[in-house]
Amino acid sequence: MIAIIDYGVGNLFSLLSSFKRIGADAVVTSDKEMIEKADKIILPGVGAFQDAAKKLRESGLGEVVKKQAQNGKPLMGICLGMQLLFEKSFEYGEHEGLGLLKGKVVPIKGAVDPSLKIPQIGWNGLHFTRSHPLFKYIQEGDHAYFVHSYYATDCEDSLLATTEYGKELTAAVAQGNVMGCQFHPEKSGEVGLRILRGFCELE
């Protein structure tokens, strides 16, 4: 069973629907016991890093997710959920993340040509830095759907894929059982479903 963490951030039911479409057993939950019993965990998220980190901390869900990941359970963060896996974010100040991956989250603005629209919204290509079972069903250059104004950097240890938007931006990361996608698999059509299938098949 896959636990999609419900901590009041993000459209969780489109994600749940995507898992159902590929025949996966997934639930949206904030129940700590259910998260502990799950085989895999999805940490979704949209919005501000500070607010999401606060909700995870105050609900105690952040600690549960972190402990499960440290025990070896497959965990995938999506969009803001991926950013929360890192040590810190510089979104409107400096805020601590879960610290499961080395790196930080910084604004796209100032790092790319000022003529580019921020946030990056829309389809963009994925360029792999290495092979990984998460991407076993997709190909180099396949397109995924992005909506973000911040990106992960200083994350060479976990970098899995980049996308080009004025410069190379982190699109996906993976280190051991912890992984993340900056894009939204649930909004990325067949490519997104194939990525979720790859996640479901991880040991």
Report the location of each language-model feature.
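N-terminal beta1-alpha1 ligand-phosphate binding loop
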Residues: I2-A24, E186-K187
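Short gly/ser/thr-rich secondary-structure transition/capping motifs
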Residues: R21-V28, L56-S59, W123-T129, T162-E164
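Short acidic low-complexity segments
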Residues: A26-K37
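Structural motif
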Residues: I42-P44
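Cysteine-nucleophile active-site neighborhood
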Residues: G47-Q120
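Pocket-forming structural segment of enzyme catalytic cores
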Residues: K88-Y165
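C-terminal and late-domain segments of enzyme folds
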Residues: Y151-E203
